[in-house]
Amino acid sequence: MSNALPSRIDRVGVLVALAATGVFLLHGFRGNLGQDAAVYAYAGQRVADGVPPYVGILNRSGPLAHLVPGVGALVGRVVGTDDLLAMRVLLALVSVASVWLAYLVARDWCGSRLAGLVAGTTMLTFGGFVHYATYGPREKTTMIFCILLTLWAIGRRRWVTAGVGTALATLTWQGAFFPLVVAALVALLLLPGRRSTLSALGRYLGAGVVVTAVTLLGFWVVGALRAFLEGFLLVNLGYTEQRGLLEAWARVPEILRPVYGWSTVLLIGGSLACVVLAALAARRLDRASPTAVGVVATGAGVLAELGFSLTAFQGWPDALVFVPFAALGTAGVLHLLTRALDARARRAVLAVASVALLVAAAQGSWSTRNTLLEEQREQAHALLAVTGPEATVLSIGSPQPLVLADLDNPIRHQMFLNGMTEFVDDTRPGGLEQLVEDLERIRPTIIAVDRPVTHDWLQPLLAEDYVRLGGSRASVRWFVIDTLSREDVRRARELVHAGPLTTEVPLVGRSGP
């Protein structure tokens, strides 16, 4: 690996950012709103309404998973556009910045702008990354940016920035803590001289502590510190039930391929390539070289994240944490393999690879585009029209109608899977029994549920007071209050069966280059 190039924003970097913008524009911003994205969109809307994270909706991710979409919604309201569209545009800009950061890190590693171009275009081939760039919001979009910012800072020995990036990544998605802390500690331990190591360690830890302290202070000021501690720490440490790669090791390609398609090979191979590059760099390590140390540190980070994923891996979205590493590893290996060529041939190979990756990314972006958002919105409003002007909606794990109609959930708790039921029962005053009594008193007109069969505490209420309209096993199940007329129930059922809110749009795999 080579010494870093000058840090100025060069023309190739601008080209990478423009390419990313083009790929995201091809995908569009009018795609369907899925359940997971709706959770963060609803959280963002509540933040824009002035409700602190975890108070509007309790979930397990970090507060930035609420705050970043909230900033988007606020900007949208200022300029007079739709909340969700504004959130998606903001997250697309964050994704463009992530692609640009991947370019910078790979450029520094390899001393080659074309290698950086390979890293950026590789990121654009990952279907899950592109999907949530414009069909979110999702917390892992912000997490990817923070990971790359931290890796860039480690490679430049900018320890304050690295500490800030680590803290922000963790405050977005807690699982990002492990690879970044391990990468930073490895880089710090490889610094020449104890004094420089201790000084850099102090700056790194100090920056992270300051960011964390400011976060805690902010929640204390708005009276939501307990809610923060519950959502960020308590539910994860004491209640969350997770599967890991150990339970599904042989099924990883099957899990990833429907979303990542042919780029599953790059996702897995590129991540492992980071480890190989780190091992090669460590053999003759120049500890005075920030980029060489950065390569070794990044490989250690991949191993740390792999170790975490062995016990906590819920599906293809959790693979997004490997996207930055896979892009860097792919670029690094390709640059290494072309070193035997003369300079002109090497540049040609890297340029052709970048073009092929970009073409594949553009084709994949276009082929997975959909425009179901407006139909979803129309269905939500039509259901409300059928059920009356005073209709209220309760979400149990399915906040799409709340987001699309800009409604408040009557209760803070919406998530009840993977240990959350036990958490609510233990921590909510009166537990689940009191919650059911509250719902009987509120009597929401419409209930949107993710998996009613798994919610034993809810089933008696649904059976006694509600009529099932239908829905999809992969998305929302709809129930309406039994006081509606037969005609209104019939019309509502027709809307549910005809509309896109009952459909979870599959993410088809990407075509090859």
Residue map of PLM features:
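Hydrophobic/aromatic-rich transmembrane helices and adjacent perimembrane loops
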Residues: 306-344
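Short acidic/glycine- and proline-prone juxtamembrane loop motifs at membrane-interface regions
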Residues: 132-140
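Transmembrane-helix motifs of polytopic, lipid-linked glycan transferases
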Residues: 89-110, 125
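Short periplasmic/luminal acceptor-recognition loop of GT-C membrane glycosyltransferases, typified by
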Residues: 162, 369-425, 432-456
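Membrane-interface alpha helices of multi-pass inner-membrane proteins
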Residues: 22, 120, 147-153, 159-186, ...
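Extracytoplasmic catalytic/substrate-binding loops of multi-pass membrane glycan-assembly enzymes
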Residues: 29-43, 53-72, 78-85, 223, ...
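Membrane-interface transmembrane helices that cradle and orient dolichyl/undecaprenyl
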Residues: 147-161, 273-288, 334-337
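Membrane-interface helix-loop-helix junctions at transmembrane boundaries of multi-pass membrane enzymes
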Residues: 4-9, 107-109, 192-205, 272-300, ...
